[in-house]
From Swiss-Prot:
Subunit (UniProt): Homotrimer. The subunits circularize to form a toroid; DNA passes through its center. Replication factor C (RFC) is required to load the toroid on the DNA.
Pfam families in UniProt: PCNA_C, PCNA_N
One GO process term, biological-process aspect: leading strand elongation
Function: Sliding clamp subunit that acts as a moving platform for DNA processing. Responsible for tethering the catalytic subunit of DNA polymerase and other proteins to DNA during high-speed replication.
Molecular function per GO: DNA binding; DNA polymerase processivity factor activity
Similarity comment text for this entry: Belongs to the PCNA family.
Naturally occurring in which organism (per UniProt): Methanopyrus kandleri (strain AV19 / DSM 6324 / JCM 9639 / NBRC 100938)
Domain of life of the source: Archaea
Presence of keyword DNA-binding: yes
Protein known as: DNA polymerase sliding clamp
HAMAP family assigned: DNApol_clamp_arch
Source taxonomy: Archaea, Methanobacteriati, Methanobacteriota, Methanomada group, Methanopyri
Length: 253
C-alpha cells in the first residue's frame, strides 16, 4: 500500500540535492509528514551535517501520509539512482509501509521505477542553533568558482568578510588564490556583517557540497570566527526547498 506520494515535474532539483548530500553523508532518514519531507544526518567523522527540507509547496502534487513516516536511506544507492535522471525527467517519490521507498523517473509516458529497502537509522541529529557574525547570499556560480579556484593551490580554504568584501582565500606551495566579491556586486545578493571574520575549512567537503549549486536558485553562507560554516542552497521552482550543510572549521596548528 502506498503511504505517501510526492511528484515534481523537474527531477533536476532532486538530482543535484541528493547527489550533493550523498557525497557528504552515507546514511540518512527520510521523514515524511503532512507538511513535506525532511532529512537530517551527520557524516561518519562528525565533521559535516546535511539537512534537506522539501515542503509540500515544492511539489506539483503531494499526497501526505495519515501519520508521520520515517524511512532509512543508503545515500550511495539514492545517488546512483538520481544520477540517472535526464534533463526532461519528472520524479515521483512514494513509500510503502516504512519498508520501501520508490523513486520513479521518466517523461512522455516512459517511466523507470526504482525500489529501495529502508535501512535502520540509529540516530537523527538536531539541527544546530548558532549565532553567526556574517550572513551573505550569493549566486551559485560564485561559490562554485571560488571553491574550484581554491582547490588549484591548497586542500584548505579560508572564508571571510572584511569591510564591504566577502572572500575565499587559499594558499599553498603552488601559489595563492583570493576569489572575492564586494557589496553591491551582482553576484552578492545580500550582505550582513557584524564583525570581520576569517575561518579555515577543509576543501574536500566543500567540493562535494557545491554539487548542489547546479540546481540551486541562490546560496546563503553564514559563518563566525572559528565556528562551523553553514551553506544553504535554495532548491525548487521558486526556491521553496533548501539543502543546508554545516561544516566544522579546520583547526590549524
Amino acid at each position: 500500500m502506498v503511504e505517501f506520494r510526492a511528484y515534481q515535474e523537474e527531477a533536476r532539483y532532486f538530482k543535484y540535492a541528493f547527489n550533493a548530500a550523498g557525497k557528504v553523508v552515507e546514511e540518512a532518514p527520510l521523514i515524511v509528514t503532512e507538511n513535506g519531507i525532511v532529512s537530517r544526518a551527520m557524516d561518519a567523522s562528525h565533521i559535516a551535517m546535511a539537512v534537506l527540507e522539501m515542503p509540500w509547496e515544492m511539489f506539483d502534487e503531494y499526497e501526505p501520509p495519515s501519520d508521520e513516516l520515517m524511512y532509512g536511506l543508503d545515500m550511495e544507492e539514492v545517488t546512483r539512482i538520481v544520477r540517472r535522471a535526464r534533463v526532461t525527467d519528472e520524479i515521483t517519490l512514494e513509500g510503502e509501509d516504512e519498508e520501501e521507498v520508490i523513486i520513479k523517473l521518466g517523461s512522455s509516458g516512459y517511466e523507470r521505477e526504482f525500489r529501495l529497502r529502508s535501512i535502520d537509522i540509529d540516530d537523527i541529529p538536531d539541527e544546530p542553533e548558532l549565532d553567526f557574525a556574517v550572513e551573505v547570499t550569493v549566486v551559485p556560480d560564485f561559490i562554485q568558482d571560488a571553491v574550484r579556484d581554491a582547490d588549484l593551490v591548497s586542500d584548505t580554504v579560508k572564508v571571510g568578510a572584511k569591510g564591504n568584501t566577502f572572500y575565499f582565500k587559499a594558499e599553498g606551495e603552488r601559489g595563492r588564490v583570493i576569489p572575492k566579491v564586494q557589496e553591491g556586486a551582482e553576484a552578492l545578493l545580500t550582505f550582513e556583517v557584524e564583525e570581520d571574520v576569517e575561518t579555515a575549512y577543509p576543501l574536500d567537503y566543500l567540493k562535494d557540497m557545491i554539487q548542489a549549486a547546479q540546481g540551486a536558485e541562490s546560496v546563503r553562507i553564514r559563518l563566525g570566527q572559528d565556528m562551523p560554516l553553514e551553506l544553504t542552497f535554495r532548491i525548487g521552482p521558486a526556491g521553496e526547498g533548501k539543502l543546508t550543510f554545516y561544516l566544522a572549521p579546520r583547526v590549524e596548528e
